[in-house]
Amino acid sequence: MFRGARRADLDAILKIYVRARQAMADSGNPTQWGDHFPPQELLEEDIDSNRLFLYLVNGELEGVFAFILGPDPTYARIEDGKWLNDTLPYGTIHRLASAGRHPGAVITWCLEHCESLRADTHADNKIMQHLLEKNGFTKCGIIHVEDGTPRIAYQKMSLTLPLRRD
C-alpha cells in the first residue's frame, strides 16, 4: 500500500534512511548521502508539499521516496546524452530508501501516475543503478545537482502510453 507521509511518520522515516545510508556505505557509496542526508527539514518540507510517500507492506514501512510531478530544475541541462523524451510532462523519484524486500514496487507505482519517469543517482550508487536498469530505465546522460556534483540521469517511459498521432 502506498500513501502520503505524515509528520507523525518521521521517526520511522528517519530510521529507514539511517539503514539506507549504512547500506550505501557498506556497498562502497559512503559519500552520496553522508551521515545526515536527507535532513529532517527537507523531509518535513516534502511532507508539507505532499510529495513524500511511504510504501507499506502488512503495515510495516518498506520504503520512502519523494515523487515529484513537473519540471525538475536540475534536469534542465543534461550532458553526454539526451532525455528519451523532452516534451512530455514527467515525474521524478528522489530520496528513495527501502528495506529492499520488494524491489521495483516504487517504480511501478510511480509509472502508474505519470507517462515519463526520471531519476538520478551517484556514480558510486551501484545498487540504485542496478535497480533502475533492471526495471527498464535508460541511462540518458549526466546532470548536476544543486551543489554541482554530477549524477547519472535515467528515464523510463510508461508502457501504457496511449498512441499519439500528432
Regions of interest found by a model, annotated:
Residues 120, 138-152:
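Conserved catalytic-core motifs of GNAT/GCN5-like acyltransferases
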Residues 49-67:
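Conserved beta-hairpin
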Residues 1-15:
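A short beta-loop-alpha structural element at the N-terminal edge
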Residues 22-41:
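Conserved GNAT-fold acetyl-CoA-binding loop/helix
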Residues 95-112, 129-134:
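Conserved acetyl-CoA-binding loop-helix of GNAT-fold acetyltransferases
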Residues 66-101:
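Conserved acyl-donor/pantetheine-binding loop and adjacent beta-alpha core of acyl/acetyltransferases
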Residues 98, 119-130, 147:
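Conserved beta-strand-loop-alpha-helix junction that forms the acyl-donor binding cleft
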Residues 92, 113-124:
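Conserved GNAT acetyl-CoA-binding A-motif
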